[in-house]
């Protein structure tokens, strides 16, 4: 296994002068592995917090974060106890895992003694604080420290501001946050940071000497400070006496101090060559201000590394779980004491909770296995042929809707990535703003614009400008000192009426405002710029060539598995959500479309598949779409459990019959899915499920309009035969795949590298926000502040919060809703295909090998195989 990144490197502070130069750019790039890019909240995209650390195991990362940051990424004991009470953890599996652990660790004592101790410790009850504070236990620890077990002689590097006192560390974060907000502001403030165009460090350098928040002495310290960020970093590091070998670890510690703001800087540096040094400049500002704050205290006293293991909790564990008395402990020989201390150290809290988590995950995997292997789909009615086929996003919220839709009639459903393999940038009618409607790990290759006839478009544009002018005038008055005083008088009556309506009758008010806006704007019928016309300002071609049209259609159909037996009507279903007063609205939309609705992509694909020229080219690839098959586009509104039609061309008789049948069953499907979903949402009771669902979407005081992707736990890649009719409880990403149509394995590789990666990121973001909400979550929605148009903070001086609010993962203050399980990926394919995938895809193999995902497969004979254990053998 490869060596772990330097986050895991244990270091002693070495107060020595630099003896050699180093490449600062390379060190910053390497240090950036400990953080993840953070996208603006308007295009909220799931982020895997530990994506740069997958070269090491999940447990190694957990230990390092616990020791360096006091951040625990294993679920706490109370979460496991609750899961056990709900029957989600099989104790038999837990016991087997303990036996396996003991078999692989020679305890150096009688097996019965070791097993009894570990079983008692595995109950997860806390050692009483009185015992840990006991003088007698401390005396025993002092005696045992004389050579029974090696002590820790190292410590993790931390910013020097930490050792200068909590005040210095807090002030450093406070100042850095302030400058980040000023530099990154996206049009929220009326005042723009001077010299911003020169870069973050240069702007800071020219303005910091005038910062009224600094004392005169602090400002004077920065007189003559280097103009170049690399020189500033080197000067600060030399002043701190950080050795060359420790520089990267020191930079990592600073990045981890504010991972949200650092993550935003990292993301910005990856988007434009103009800002490619932004993360380096961020570190230069941070180190410069750290030097300014700690310079009076230099040289700081050398931190005292731990010279011995903290034996108190180890001895206390044997008194508590091992049933020993202090007298019995003293009767043990030195070798016996050492063996017991070694076992207690190895079977520590992290090891115990690792076993609990793995038992929980294996219990869930066993349930999925039982559901799949025992699933016997109802035989299709031979008298009723398939009327329509639906392609849904793999999103876990699609699973209940697909299940209900299939039960309602002769329909087939398929799962694929919600951007439908369309690497496009979209531009809606009447706006210059474009959106990259694809996963954030990809870049758009084509631009598609909405167009309309000149006269209706002109009217629409005028109405839209009028609405925008009103909004702009309101914002201008709000930010102007004198006009702001008049604003309450001018806007008070209207805003009071709006507040009363939205508070007292949110459902009716929301619908009324929506209808009024729609009536006022009068958006005309639109077309899509499918034909290649020009190149956009960003250098992206607008529209497609004939070959590109066919290539996109071919790729999408193959990825979703619809290449033959076409129904009269094929519906491409994007998905989006609807909520009010919700800064996390984009988190409820399609993650595969960059935190937006997949409606635009669905329209593009459906339109391409209806083109005769595209169908003609597809025939040469063996994909024969019947002349009477029509593609339509719809949007699955997850907050309302509704399907809204977006694009329905002229329909021949059979397709019209299918369309009518779909419309007749959709109300019942919506009611069924809505009632199922409402049972999981905290609410005070309701009489009409449909009205309650609409209220959740329109109520601006609603902190939880829907659960989003909470409780996601598995990603199943295979034919619908595996899961059709099975109730997966909205916890599974479902991607259609038939290994028989994938001879070279390219389709499976594409699924794993694309949708599989996005699903893993989603899974680990929900996981992190649940187990460590104070560090990886974003706190309470009710107390959040939208900051600089970029993201949210708690108050006005916190880190930029990268994760999900507790309302997205918690049922109440004391009860979690999301089960923090690492993603289980199940692939329907022969063993040889899985081995080929693992041999080709080193990154995917590494994820499974190091415990970032779990991998299982089902072969053509229906046999289940757990690959995670096989890989590690």
UniProtKB/Swiss-Prot annotation:
Zn(2+) binds at residues 393, 395, 575, 590. One of its GO terms (molecular function) is zinc ion binding. Its main location: membrane. GO terms for cellular component: plasma membrane. It is a peripheral membrane protein. Keywords: Cell membrane, Membrane, Metal-binding, Transport, Zinc. InterPro entries: DabA (IPR018752). It is found in: Cell membrane. The keyword Protease does not apply. Its cofactor is Zn(2+). It comes from the Bacteria. Forms a complex with DabB. Belongs to the inorganic carbon transporter (TC 9.A.2) DabA family. PANTHER family: INORGANIC CARBON TRANSPORTER SUBUNIT DABA-RELATED, UPF0753 PROTEIN AQ_863. Part of an energy-coupled inorganic carbon pump. This is Probable inorganic carbon transporter subunit DabA. It comes from Bacillus licheniformis (strain ATCC 14580 / DSM 13 / JCM 2505 / CCUG 7422 / NBRC 12200 / NCIMB 9375 / NCTC 10341 / NRRL NRS-1264 / Gibson 46). The gene is dabA.
């Amino acid at each position: 296994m490869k060596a772990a990144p330097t986050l895991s490197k244990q270091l002693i502070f070495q107060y020595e002068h630099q003896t050699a130069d180093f490449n600062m750019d390379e060190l910053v790039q390497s240090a950036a592995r400990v953080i993840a890019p953070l996208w603006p909240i308007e295009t909220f995209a799931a982020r895997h917090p530990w994506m740069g650390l997958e070269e090491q195991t999940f447990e190694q990362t957990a230990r390092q974060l616990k020791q360096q940051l006091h951040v625990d990424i294993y679920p706490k004991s109370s979460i496991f106890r609750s899961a056990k009470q709900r029957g989600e953890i099989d104790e038999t599996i837990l016991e087997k895992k303990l036996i396996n652990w003991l078999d692989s660790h020679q305890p150096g004592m009688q097996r019965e003694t070791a097993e009894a101790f570990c079983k008692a410790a595995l109950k997860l009850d806390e050692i009483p604080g009185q015992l840990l504070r006991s003088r007698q236990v401390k005396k025993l620890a002092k005696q045992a420290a004389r050579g029974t077990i090696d002590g820790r002689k190292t410590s993790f590097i931390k910013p020097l501001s930490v050792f200068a006192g909590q005040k210095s560390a807090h002030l450093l974060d406070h100042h850095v946050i302030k400058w980040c907000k000023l530099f990154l502001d996206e049009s929220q403030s009326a005042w723009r940071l001077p010299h911003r165009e020169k870069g973050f460090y240069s702007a800071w350098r020219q303005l910091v000497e005038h910062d009224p928040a600094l004392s005169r002495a602090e400002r004077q310290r920065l007189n003559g400070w280097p103009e170049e960020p690399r020189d500033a970093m080197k000067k600060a590091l030399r002043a701190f006496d950080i050795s060359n070998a420790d520089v990267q670890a020191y930079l990592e510690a600073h990045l981890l101090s504010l991972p949200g703001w650092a993550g935003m800087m990292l993301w910005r540096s990856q988007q434009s060559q103009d800002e490619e040094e932004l993360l380096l400049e961020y570190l230069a500002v941070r180190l410069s201000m750290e030097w300014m704050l700690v310079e009076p205290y230099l040289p700081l006293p050398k931190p005292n590394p731990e010279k011995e293991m903290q034996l108190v909790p180890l001895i206390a564990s044997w008194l508590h779980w091992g049933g020993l008395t202090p007298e019995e402990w003293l009767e043990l020989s030195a070798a016996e004491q050492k063996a017991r201390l070694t076992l207690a150290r190895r079977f520590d809290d992290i090891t115990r909770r690792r076993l609990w988590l793995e038992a929980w995950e294996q219990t869930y995997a066993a349930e999925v296995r039982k559901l799949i292997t025992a699933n016997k789909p109802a035989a299709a009615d031979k008298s009723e042929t398939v009327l329509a086929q639906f392609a849904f996003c793999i999103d876990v919220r699609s699973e209940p809707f697909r299940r209900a839709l299939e039960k309602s009639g002769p329909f087939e459903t398929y799962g694929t990535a919600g951007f439908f393999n369309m690497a496009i940038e979209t531009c809606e009618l009447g706006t210059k703003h474009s959106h990259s409607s694809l996963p954030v790990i990809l870049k758009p290759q084509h631009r598609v614009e909405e167009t309309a006839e000149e006269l209706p478009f002109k009217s629409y544009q005028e109405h839209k400008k009028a609405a925008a002018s009103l909004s702009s005038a309101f914002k201008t008055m709000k930010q102007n000192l004198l006009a702001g005083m008049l604003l309450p008088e001018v806007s008070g009556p209207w805003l009071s009426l709006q507040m009363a309506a939205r508070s007292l009758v949110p459902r009716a008010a929301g619908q009324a405002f929506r209808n009024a806006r729609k009536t006022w704007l009068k958006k005309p019928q639109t077309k899509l710029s499918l034909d290649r016309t020009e190149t956009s300002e960003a250098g992206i071609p607008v529209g497609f060539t004939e070959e590109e049209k066919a290539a996109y259609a071919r790729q999408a159909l193959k990825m979703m598995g619809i290449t033959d037996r076409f129904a009269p009507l094929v519906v491409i279903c994007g998905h989006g959500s609807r909520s009010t007063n919700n800064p996390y609205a984009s988190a409820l939309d399609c993650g595969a479309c960059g935190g937006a609705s997949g409606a635009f992509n669905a329209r593009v694909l459906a339109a391409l598949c209806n083109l005769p020229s595209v169908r003609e080219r597809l025939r040469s690839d063996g994909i024969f779409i019947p002349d009477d098959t029509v593609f339509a586009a719809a949007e699955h509104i997850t907050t309302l459990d509704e399907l809204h039609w977006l694009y329905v061309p002229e329909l021949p008789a059979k397709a019209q019959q299918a369309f009518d049948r779909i419309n007749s069953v959709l109300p019942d499907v919506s009611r069924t899915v809505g009632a199922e979903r409402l049972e999981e949402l905290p609410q005070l009771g309701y009489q009409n499920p449909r009205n309650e669902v609409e209220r959740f979407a329109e109520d601006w005081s609603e902190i939880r309009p829907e659960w989003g992707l909470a409780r996601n736990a598995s990603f199943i890649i295979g034919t619908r035969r595996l899961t059709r009719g099975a109730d997966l409880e909205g916890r599974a990403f479902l991607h259609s795949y038939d290994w028989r149509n994938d001879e070279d394995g390219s389709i499976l590789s594409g699924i794993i590298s694309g949708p599989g990666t996005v699903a893993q990121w989603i899974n680990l973001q929900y996981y992190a926000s649940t187990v460590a909400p104070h560090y990886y979550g974003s706190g309470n929605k009710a107390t959040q502040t939208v900051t600089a148009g970029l993201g949210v903070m708690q108050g006005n001086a916190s880190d930029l919060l990268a994760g999900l609010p507790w309302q997205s993962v918690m049922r109440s203050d004391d009860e979690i809703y999301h089960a923090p399980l690492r993603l289980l990926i199940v692939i329907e394919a022969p063993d040889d295909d899985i081995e080929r995938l693992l041999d080709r895809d080193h990154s995917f193999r590494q994820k499974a090998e190091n415990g970032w995902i779990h991998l299982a497969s089902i072969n053509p004979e229906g046999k289940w195989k757990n690959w995670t254990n096989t890989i590690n053998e």
